[in-house]
Amino acid sequence: MSKEKFERLKPHVNVGTIGHVDHGKTTLTAAICTVLAKVYGGDAKDFASIDNAPEERERGITISTSHVEYDTPARHYAHVDCPGHADYVKNMITGAAQMDGGILVVAATDGPMPQTREHILLGRQVGIPYIIVFMNKCDMVDDEELLELVEMEVRELLSEYDFPGDDCPVIMGSALGALNGEAQWEEKIIELAEALDNYIPEPERAIDLPFILPIEDVFSIQGRGTVVTGRVEQGIVRVGEEVAIIGIKETTTTTCTGVEMFRKLLDEGRAGENVGVLLRGTKRDDVERGQVLAKPGSITPHTTFTSEIYVLSKDEGGRHTPFFKGYRPQFYFRTTDVTGTIELPEGVEMVMPGDNIAMTVTLIAPIAMDEGLRFAIREGGRTVGAGVVATIIA
């Protein structure tokens, strides 16, 4: 049984396939699983089992996603593949499947297509940090020059959306050829795996990031002071450290004088743990749900930002009618709703249920935020959309 234990010690990296419909994303996913299982051990998966993606619900939104896993000698990968374009849009915006890197699949026979562009743009908006290109169906193109032309187009498209188009690895292969066991194409899958290992840096673990705890509840304990409770989102809070209380009101700083979990006193609270944090000299009314406790200076409160939004369809329990400029819903960040106004892109008059769109949001109260923060859009407690902070304006 020692082998199983060893596997868990490898760094864990989340990736996924993106790209235009029918360019071979699912075939490539199957090919990676099959070839790597053959070479490094692991479970092979066939096309049908990946394509038959189960439906999941993330914040009330129905998304079909396939999750597969594979290993290289250096790492363990969790890989997501979505059957339909709408699933990708929802997946990226809700962050249902966070990606440390994306594999952009482009058919050499077609070159970049509309969804190729849309997925690159979405990747930029939602913060996929690295993209590797797999040019697929190269066995169907005889002309070297055509392959070079497609590669150039893809690199230019990546650069247009602020990815380092000149430096992204581009692998030319045939997913179907590799799946059918043709040696020259299997080699290209190994080359892709090496690019994943070398080009996507090991992600920072939540525990190594600066401390953040979204406040869920506030209690006053006689003779001891004020306790806030919540789940530590990232980092570590230690007794005796300074912490900032950020969002909704003016930012204040105080000292953590105690951490407790299940009524036991601890020296520290770590990412993923539900804890109570005792705050020195803080009154019950100084703190409220929706604020965050954080390492001072690590995160700042903002009211205005651009975002990428997915609006739930009627079938998903969303609105039945479009909304227009001047729409004022609640934006649910972490643990609380804040009212905000929206500004639609130039030339867009209305937004229909089922659409995805970039918009600027202005909140009536500041919220601790960073680019990449996910939120829900609600009307009277009902979720009508999901979004992600793309860039902070003020």
Curated annotation (Swiss-Prot):
UniProt region (G2), positions on chain: 60-64
Q: Does the keyword Metal-binding apply?
A: yes
Domain (tr-type G) spans: 10-204
Record localization: Cytoplasm
The reactions it catalyses are: GTP + H2O = GDP + phosphate + H(+)
UniProt: GTP binding residues: 19-26, 81-85, 136-139
- Quick check: keyword Protein biosynthesis in the entry? yes
Q: Which cysteine pairs are joined by S-S bonds? A: none
- Region G5: which residues? 174-176
EC number annotated for this UniProt entry: 3.6.5.3
Query: Which Pfam family, just one, is annotated for this protein?
Result: GTP_EFTU_D2
- Location of region: G4: 136-139
One annotated GO molecular function is:
GTP binding
For this UniProt record, give its keywords in alphabetical order, as a comma-separated list: Cytoplasm, Elongation factor, GTP-binding, Hydrolase, Magnesium, Metal-binding, Nucleotide-binding, Protein biosynthesis
Which domain of life does this protein belong to?
Answer: Bacteria
Q: Which EC class heads this enzyme's classification?
A: hydrolase
Annotated region described as G3, given as residue ranges: 81-84
Gene3D superfamilies, per database record: P-loop containing nucleotide triphosphate hydrolases, Translation factors
Which residues hold Mg(2+)? 26
Q: How does it assemble?
A: Monomer.
Q: Which family does it belong to?
A: Belongs to the TRAFAC class translation factor GTPase superfamily. Classic translation factor GTPase family. EF-Tu/EF-1A subfamily.
Protein task: GTP hydrolase that promotes the GTP-dependent binding of aminoacyl-tRNA to the A-site of ribosomes during protein biosynthesis.
NCBIfam families documented for this protein: EF-Tu (TIGR00485), PRK00049.1 (NF000766), PRK12735.1 (NF009372), PRK12736.1 (NF009373), small_GTP (TIGR00231)
Q: What is this protein called?
A: Elongation factor Tu 1
Species in which this protein is naturally found: Photobacterium profundum (strain SS9)
